[in-house]
């Protein structure tokens, strides 16, 4: 496994200013940061919220992960979702991380949402009533990763487990 700082293997952006008030019956698909606290998805390949398109919107490429920029606690904010579909508008209050090809988005999302990386991410959160995390905080996180083939196998395994859990919860 290789160990690198996230800032060495990824670039960063911020979601655009969409909020819950912008939700419409139809329009462009929209991912809002609140979904991370209601759906708890590590892999996002579809959304059920829509908004009217507007200039300056940041759309997913299908290869990024999102990390909330704010939350109620350090533990809440220490999570990530891989956006695996192109063309989803990324709403406000999201840190958007574009990993280089040496790291798969799904593997990185699982890594940041669990274990020692999640603990380190929680430690970076700042604030009392509302905690925040910025791209500059994310850049310094140490990330360990195997080769891409193994990352894909790990991501597929955990994604299959998530799907199975979701299926059983619906019963």
What are these regions (language model features)?
Residues 1-15, 140, 148:
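Non-catalytic DNA-recognition/assembly elements of restriction-modification systems
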Residues 37-50, 65-91, 106-110, 119-123:
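Short, ligand-facing micro-motifs at secondary-structure edges
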Residues 99-104:
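Ligand-binding loop in jelly-roll beta-barrel domains
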Residues 2, 152-164, 168:
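Extracellular/lumenal glycan-associated surfaces
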Residues 17-18, 52, 128-130, 139-146, ...:
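Short, recurring structural edge motifs at helix starts
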């Amino acid at each position: 496994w290789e160990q690198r700082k996230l800032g060495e293997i990824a670039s960063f952006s911020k979601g655009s200013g969409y909020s819950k008030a912008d939700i419409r019956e139809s329009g462009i698909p929209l991912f809002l940061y609140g979904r991370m606290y209601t759906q708890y998805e590590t892999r996002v390949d579809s959304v059920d919220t829509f908004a009217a398109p507007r200039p300056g919107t940041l759309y997913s490429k299908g290869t990024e992960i999102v990390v909330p920029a704010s939350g109620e606690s350090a533990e809440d904010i220490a999570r990530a979702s891989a956006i695996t579909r192109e063309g989803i508008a990324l709403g406000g209050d999201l840190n958007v991380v574009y990993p280089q090809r040496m790291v798969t988005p799904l593997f990185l999302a699982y890594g940041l949402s669990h274990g020692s990386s999640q603990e380190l991410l929680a430690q970076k959160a700042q604030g009392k009533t509302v905690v925040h995390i910025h791209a500059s905080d994310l850049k310094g996180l140490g990330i360990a990763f195997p080769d891409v083939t193994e990352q894909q196998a790990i991501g597929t395994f955990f994604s299959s487990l998530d799907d199975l859990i979701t299926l059983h919860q619906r019963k």
